[in-house]
Amino acid sequence: MHETSLGTTLTDYLSGESIDETTYESFRQALARLLVEERGYPKDRLKAKQDICYEIDGEPFHRPIDIVVYDPDNRPVLLVMFCSGSVGSYEREASVAARLFPGGPAPLAVVTDTTSAALLDAAGGGVLAEGMNAIPRWRQLLEMAAERRAEPLTEEQRDRLVRIFHTYSGFLFGACCQDCRPTRG
């Protein structure tokens, strides 16, 4: 299932603005509510649909990340990616996205289908915890992120990771996902 517009709007939980309702937007909204209301994240530390921009052979692309959580110093510490399939099959993509994220790398990532989740150590690789309870509370997130500060990528590392990320994301470009397309002038 790809994300498509439903032709209506809804009020965004995080910003209060009217946004396009899509096949995934209700999941994104539920994840934002869970983070704020159940896990104690300050609402102003979450940003929805934040882009990772990159180039492949000179052609620009961008891919939105569902929710990015920023620490009090405005550094990305957690990327949350919704998946419409097996959580395990999205783990590598989410880890790579966290390492490539602007202002990062973000040390942690969560991939979830809203019934299951995996908390990932983006820099070290691997799954730290599974299940919806794996999503840390705010204070716990800050502690975990401080323990896992990732070094900035070298240009060679970034180039390699961009190709991996594009391979995972590339099937979306030109498909029905309006938010995930090559950026053209």
Label each residue range with its predicted role.
Residues 110:
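A short glycine-rich, hydrophobically flanked beta-strand micro-motif that places a catalytic Asp/Glu
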